[in-house]
Amino acid sequence: MVTTLERARAAAYPAGEYVGQESFMRAAEIRALARRARVGPGVFVLDLCCGVAGPGRMITAESGCHYLGVDYCASSLATARELAGSLPCRFEQAHLPPLPGGRFEVVLLLETMLAFPDKEALVGEVERVLEPGGRFAFTVEEGRPLTQQERARMPAADTVWPVGLAELTGLLREAGLTVTWRQEHSSSHHAMATALLRCYRADSAQIAGQIGKQATAELITAHQLWSDWLGSGRVRKFAMVAEKR
C-alpha cells in the first residue's frame, strides 16, 4: 500500500527520477554513480544502509549484479524483500560498523555517510571488505561540523555529521583508497530538498494522520534546514568513487 508520505515524495521528483529512494538523489544520478563504479553483470555489490533499497533494486535490475543490502531497520528490510520480488537481491539486518563478512567488488553508501560520526572507522571497514581494485561509491555532505545552535534546530542531530572534503580524501588515502571520480550535486540536491519540502507541507495534514504530528513537523523542519544549507553553501553535496589500491 502506497502511503501519503510516499505519494508526496514521488510527486516531488521529475518524471522518471523516483525509484523509491529516501534521499535527494535522482535516478539519473544513481545510475551515473553505479556506472562510474563499474557495476555490471556478475559484480558483487554491498549496499550499506539500504533502507527499502529503491536504488539497489534499480541497479540490480538494470545491471545484473549480485546484490547484498544491509540495514538496521527490520521493517525497511521486509519492504525491500517484498518489492525485490524475483530480483537476485539478498538483505541482512545489521548495525554498522562492522560490515558483513565477505569480499565485494563495489561498496555503495548512498546519502547516509552523514550518519557516521567516526568516518575513519567506516572507511577502514569498507577497505577491509573490498577486493583489490574494488570501488567505494558514495555520496557525502561536505561542510564544517554543526554548531550547537544548528544541532538544536536539526531533528535527530546525532545522525548529522558533515565532513570536510580534504579531511575525507585524506582518510580514504590513509586507508588505501584513491578517489577516481567526483561530481558536485549541490544545486540539484538543493532543488530536490526544496521540492520535497513543498510537497510535504502541502500534504502535511494527511502525512500527520499516518506518522503523527511531531514526526511530520520534524520532517518539514529537517527539509527546510537542508534546503537552506544547500542553497547557501553551508553544506555541499558530492558523489564520489574511490578505488582500493
Describe each model-derived feature in a short phrase.
Residues Q183-R245:
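Conserved Class I S-adenosyl-L-methionine
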Residues F44-L48, V52-P97:
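Class I SAM-dependent methyltransferase SAM/SAH-binding core
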Residues P97-V107:
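A short acidic, Gly/Pro-enriched loop at the edge of an enzyme's catalytic core
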Residues V106-D118:
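A short SAM/SAH-binding and catalytic strip from SAM-dependent methyltransferases
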Residues W161-G176:
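Short alpha-helix
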Residues F138-T159:
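Short, glycine-/aromatic-enriched active-site segment of Class I SAM-dependent methyltransferases
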Residues M1-A37, G54-P55:
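Conserved class I S-adenosyl-L-methionine
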Residues E120-R135:
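A short glycine-rich, Lys/Arg-flanked "PGG" loop and its adjoining helix->strand segment in the class I
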